Amino acid sequence: FPVILSGAGVVIGGAIKDCVKLAEKLDSPVCSGYQHNDSFPGSHPLAVGPLGYNGSKAAMELISKADVVLALGTRLNPFSTLPGYGIDYWPKNAKIIQVDMNSDRIGLTKKVTVGICGDAKLVAQQILNKLSKNAGDTDRQKRKDLIHQTKSAWLQKLSSLDHEDDDPGTVWNKEARSRDKDRMSPRQAWRAIQAGMPEDVIISSDIGNNCAIGNAYPTFEKGRKYLAPGLFGPCGYGFPSILGAKIGCPDTPVIGFAGDGAFGISMNEMSSCARKEWPSITMVIFRNYQWGAEKRNSILWFDDNFVGTELDPELSYAKVATACGLKGVTVKTMEETTNALKQSCEDQKKGITTFIEVILNQELGEPFRRDAMKKPVEVAGIDTKDMRPQILKNG
């Protein structure tokens, strides 16, 4: 059961078409690395979506069945291989062929059977030329049927997935839904966004909970369409990177995404992008009034307690945009979100920059690195039973 995992190297190396040819030769499902959804055409029958944090459950289920994985142009970073949806999907007994330009990355995070230091495009072409005429014929139709069934089941599930689960012993998400019944959840917002994005759009994603929840939603037909901070993980990346994308591709619609915490780090550029010589963009700001990733860690490991994660609910980024001479819009429903996004992309053609403030409830997605932390255990405390009388000696 061959599986291809396509990474950033496929995009950077211009290897997407070669990856497609290789996948079609083998009828192999193609998973994308975390936030590299543009590394394989999303409409292709063999595309099964991104692995990693809040990725495609179909991709996870299919790669778990692999007996050989071609990791093409990827360093196999932890966000692309960590368990998701309760599935520890990495195929530990499969033969792993890792292709990366940097030899230091080969075998760094996962045990590999064959390591190839090289360009993804050239290596894909060479592998394809070396394959036998009947390569991939074993169980070919069975494999194609399984890919279709698994992918269809996941897309149906994703289209109706509205809310985030709580961990045992915590109730934050349940209370968030109850507290703000009239507000969209992050997943509802992402479905609305998906419905409003132009086909040829370039997007950027900041680091953070609400942006990462959207990992499974965007699909692309071409490369260099999805800008993401990667493992460096800097808050404040989404806004300046989408400005750069528009400067580089002035005739292409662009949309940046950021949570309200991360956006605050780079919001000073709102005054810069209002200048006439700057191209117009759309910037979406998820407004849930909290540092979500930090809060999810806190409530998970400290029994629904948190500190230092709250943001000012009185601040309006839409009003700040208006004050800077830009267009600021606040949306509260899925329909408003879709319509505002469509309008903003049309407005880009007229030289109008739009900041869309999306009001959400306070549901929180999975912790980014559940594997990296453990619930704290009290090793010492203050208890009268542990104390002994202090004897004062005279003199």
Feature names for model-found ranges:
Residues S152-C249:
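Active-site diphosphate/adenylate-binding microenvironment
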Residues S28-Y34, I97-D100, M283-F286:
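Short internal beta-strands
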